[in-house]
């Protein structure tokens, strides 16, 4: 499996528990960080791009599927500052995390549980 696909599978697992840098990701794949960088560059991507894509996916999941406070989501995705998370969400979704959460919830169909 190409290294970029391996990372896309690994990063969500690692990021749910801690902030992940290139050294931690490389160690999990038993690679030297520089070797991983070279392999990713050969595929036309970077660790930073894959981590950003993973953060976007996890942010979307947390914002839509949970009521976790924004500061906690930001921290769990490795942001030390809520303002940086806000900027990332605006870049990804063209709106703030609160607006994205609100709009996503309004547009989701209500699922009714069967009555007993």
Regions found by a protein language model. Name each.
Residues 1-111, 116:
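Extended mid-to-C-terminal alpha-helical interaction segments
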């Amino acid at each position: 499996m190409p290294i970029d696909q391996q990372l896309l599978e690994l990063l969500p697992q690692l990021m749910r528990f801690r902030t992940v840098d290139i050294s931690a990701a490389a160690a999990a794949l038993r690679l030297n960080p520089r070797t991983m960088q070279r392999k990713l560059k050969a595929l036309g991507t970077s660790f930073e791009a894959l981590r950003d894509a993973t953060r976007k996916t996890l942010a979307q999941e947390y914002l839509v599927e949970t009521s976790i406070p924004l500061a906690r989501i930001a921290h769990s995705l490795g942001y030390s500052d809520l303002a940086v998370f806000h900027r990332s969400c605006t870049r990804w979704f063209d709106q703030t995390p609160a607006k994205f959460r609100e709009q996503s919830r309004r547009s989701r169909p209500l699922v009714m549980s069967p009555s007993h």
